[in-house]
């Protein structure tokens, strides 16, 4: 490998940023992400106006998070995922919520997975595997991640309510499945205990965040973490 190529590869790993625009007849989505945190922005917002009372937004020197999917509980979950993964993340979505929450939730999962994959770039110099546990009061969840380029998801949250806020509970595992498929990762998430479905869901997203944060962290080398010598 030439010296310029090496420098370019190191720069890409260092930045780990991406911007995704995904437009269909059902949803319009823009996502900006930095896996390393720090400052990000979307210059041309697709949102007609932003509310002043957003609860899925925060900005510090280390992270910028601003989530607007049109589905409040989905915003809350993506916010938790970004916060505890150490990402900076902006999500804007205009979806056909007059139908239901399916297209918006699924497409946000797909677009986030695409953004993650693009920001991650070559799986090199990272741990690849990550495991996370996270409690929320009585609820406890576990997540295991493999940056394998083998998309697969096993999700068992044991949710019993039909809705949490304005989000159908059936769409919560489907969001995670859509994310895993588009990100091309293997993902196992299960809630081990808990009786409050809000707590079960939130602990699952936080556990996933902990697992992803470990998986994308440096392993101290510039090697591909695979016996194949390649993950692509």
Swiss-Prot record:
Quote the protein name from its UniProt record. Imidazoleglycerol-phosphate dehydratase
| Pathway in which the depicted protein is active | Amino-acid biosynthesis; L-histidine biosynthesis; L-histidine from 5-phospho-alpha-D-ribose 1-diphosphate: step 6/9
Entry's HAMAP family?
HisB (MF_00076)
* Record-linked PANTHER family: IMIDAZOLEGLYCEROL-PHOSPHATE DEHYDRATASE, IMIDAZOLEGLYCEROL-PHOSPHATE DEHYDRATASE HIS7
What family name appears in the similarity comment?
Answer: Belongs to the imidazoleglycerol-phosphate dehydratase family.
Q: List, alphabetically, the PROSITE patterns matched.
A: IGP_DEHYDRATASE_1, IGP_DEHYDRATASE_2
Please state what class of enzyme this protein is: lyase
TM region positions = none
The Gene Ontology terms for molecular function here are: imidazoleglycerol-phosphate dehydratase activity
State any GO BP term from the record: L-histidine biosynthetic process
Q: Which UniProt keywords apply?
A: Amino-acid biosynthesis, Histidine biosynthesis, Lyase
**Catalyses which reaction(s):** D-erythro-1-(imidazol-4-yl)glycerol 3-phosphate = 3-(imidazol-4-yl)-2-oxopropyl phosphate + H2O
Q: Is the keyword Amino-acid biosynthesis assigned to this protein?
A: yes
This chain's source organism reads Lachancea kluyveri (strain ATCC 58438 / CBS 3082 / BCRC 21498 / NBRC 1685 / JCM 7257 / NCYC 543 / NRRL Y-12651)
Q: What is its EC number?
A: 4.2.1.19
């Amino acid at each position: 490998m030439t010296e310029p190529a090496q420098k370019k590869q190191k720069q890409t790993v260092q930045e780990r940023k991406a911007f995704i625009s995904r437009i269909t007849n059902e949803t319009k989505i823009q996502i900006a992400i930095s896996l390393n945190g720090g400052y990000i922005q979307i210059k041309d917002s697709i949102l007609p106006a932003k509310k002043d009372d957003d609860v899925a937004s925060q900005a510090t020197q280390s992270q910028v998070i601003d989530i607007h999917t049109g589905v409040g509980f989905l915003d809350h979950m993506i916010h938790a995922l970004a916060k505890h993964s150490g990402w900076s993340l902006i999500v804007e979505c205009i979806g056909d919520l007059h139908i239901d929450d399916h297209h918006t939730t699924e497409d946000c999962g797909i677009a986030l997975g695409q953004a993650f994959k693009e920001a991650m770039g070559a799986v090199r110099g990272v741990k690849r595997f990550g495991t996370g546990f996270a409690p929320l009061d009585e609820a406890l969840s576990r997540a295991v991640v493999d940056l394998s380029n083998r998309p697969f998801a096993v999700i068992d949250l044991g949710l019993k309510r039909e809705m949490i806020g304005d989000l159908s509970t059936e769409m919560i595992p489907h969001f995670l499945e859509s994310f895993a498929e588009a990100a091309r990762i293997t993902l196992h998430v299960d809630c081990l205990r808990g009786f409050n479905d809000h707590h079960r869901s939130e602990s699952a997203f936080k556990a996933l965040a902990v697992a992803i944060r470990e998986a994308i962290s440096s392993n101290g080398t510039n090697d591909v973490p695979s016996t194949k010598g390649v993950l692509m």
